[in-house]
Amino acid sequence: MRTSHYLLSTLKETPADAEIVSHQLMLRAGMIRKLASGLYDWMPTGVRVLRKIEKIVREEMDNAGSLEISMPVVQPADLWQESGRWEQYGPELLRFTDRGERPFVLGPTHEEVVTDIVRNEITSYKQLPLNLYQIQTKFRDEVRPRFGVMRSREFIMKDAYSFHISQESLQETYDRMYQAYSNIFTRIGLDFRPVLADTGSIGGSASHEFQVLADSGEDDIVFSTASDYAANIELAEAVMPATPRSPATEELRLVDTPNAKTIAELVEQFNLPIEKTVKTLIVHATEESGHKLVALLVRGDHELNEIKAEKCSIVASPLVFATEEEIRQAVNAGPGSLGPINLPLPIIIDRAVSVMSDFGAGANIDGKHYFGINWERDLPLAEMADIRNVVEGDPSPDGKGTLLIKRGIEVGHIFQLGKKYSEALKATVQNEEGHNQVVTMGCYGIGITRIVAAAIEQNHDARGIIWPDAIAPFQVAILPMNMHRSYRVKEVAEKLYADLRAQGIDVLFDDRKERPGVMFADMELIGVPHTIVIGDRNLDNEQVEYKARRSDDKSLVNVNDVVAFIKEQLV
């Protein structure tokens, strides 16, 4: 490609509304342009990167035995009503009616549609397992789109869905998809980790996320220092403390604390170690429990894990915190004065709270706290569960090493769905015994557009993007110095351009009448991994200069050896 025939719309200045590096560089490199909140035009440079990612994804999906299909982005509402998600999904599901007043949605995902295909096309267990995928645009009406294409409203996704007669068959496909995803992200050149994850609104039994490590990531990823254990912090288990509860050394005492309505204020004003305090959080209970509210207790320096808490049998899902009015009606005290003694609500305590002694907590009287609280002396030990986020230094759940926490960007997610959708939509086949059986499902998603941003977050410097070779918009840039004044430079540049293209190499030939500084800056900004600089001085010795974008290494290469040299760099 010649720059004279290309839309190379780079920017010198960083747009003011671009918050993270990938958003800034994608705008400056001319990869995207904002159309509206959460909506972006993809320009030629961006599309070239997308197509290379899609090619890798297709190859690995095909190798894993998945079949490509294409489903409409517009979906009839009756499928969503049939599955139950019409009521479950919030305003992020864009709903509309056609001219005949028939309700439709813009698809954020395609479980319903693909299950409808299978229930109409597949009749026998002999046609299973079946794995179908597509690469297609999705729409989710995010309340606050941000970070460019990292969290946009419209995005490109690879979504796959598998159908099985048994859990064993699902597990086999799940394992193949796990490996296919690992292959995809390895080939792209990302530093990633597969981690155990919560199934979220998709549902199902087992789930793994594929997280790209980056400081700008929105997820906290937990790793063991001594094993392969990795999990999203939402799912990482906080194991039972190994040290038993110490004997009581303090008397229970009621203390006036009129100006201490938070743990931080309590610690500061009364010189308490924060690990000797307990937070009491009130949430809604399930109807089946016979209670309106339930109290959750975590250590003062720990954070409640809402995903774990939701899994407690008497906690309503989704988790809803009680309002101050609800708390005062139930306890006759405000949120800053709550504690376990004489609390007229069911209580669930975190494992770490169960081994505490001589601790402080609210007295359920405004402006008062109890200090020196001890279980089984001042109150019975409450129901115990793992309801907190792990912290760095906690023991790994597999018993090997301790935990580290890093930030991650989720680029892939695989689920064992089970029968959630197939039962709702009555997707059955005839089994080996001749009876109708509901099929078991898996689903597997990759954020194609998000991969672009994640790759930039991992691969950039002050000058611009540093693409991994596999997804660079161009593999090689040819920069002829003063080509329009030097016939020799032009001749060598044209020949190298033709020779490299003949080898199937993506080349960007900068034939603009621009200053060398502008040419270099643009190629570094858009992240071309390999650059050939052609100038009269080096041609006197029949040489050109090669520069590697990632390492900044430079070397002189004989003109006749350039093609072979570049092919070696691309291996």
From Swiss-Prot:
Alphabetically ordered keywords of this record: Aminoacyl-tRNA synthetase, ATP-binding, Cytoplasm, Ligase, Nucleotide-binding, Protein biosynthesis
Primary location group: cytoplasm
GO biological process: prolyl-tRNA aminoacylation
Compartments (UniProt record): Cytoplasm
InterPro entries in UniProt: aa-tRNA-synt_IIb, aa-tRNA-synth_II, aa-tRNA-synth_II/BPL/LPL, Anticodon-bd, Anticodon-bd_dom_sf, Pro-tRNA-ligase_IIa, Pro-tRNA-synth_IIa_bac-type, Pro-tRNA-Synthase_IIa_type1
Reactions this protein catalyses: tRNA(Pro) + L-proline + ATP = L-prolyl-tRNA(Pro) + AMP + diphosphate
Superkingdom assignment: Bacteria
SUPFAM superfamilies named in the record: Class II aaRS ABD-related (SSF52954), Class II aaRS and biotin synthetases (SSF55681), YbaK/ProRS associated domain (SSF55826)
Disulfide bonds: none
GO molecular function: aminoacyl-tRNA deacylase activity; ATP binding; proline-tRNA ligase activity
Any Pfam family hit: HGTP_anticodon
CDD domains, A to Z: ProRS-INS, ProRS_anticodon_short, ProRS_core_prok
Protein family per UniProt: Belongs to the class-II aminoacyl-tRNA synthetase family. ProS type 1 subfamily.
Notes concerning its domains: Consists of three domains: the N-terminal catalytic domain, the editing domain and the C-terminal anticodon-binding domain.
Subunit structure and binding partners: Homodimer.
Name of the protein in question: Proline--tRNA ligase
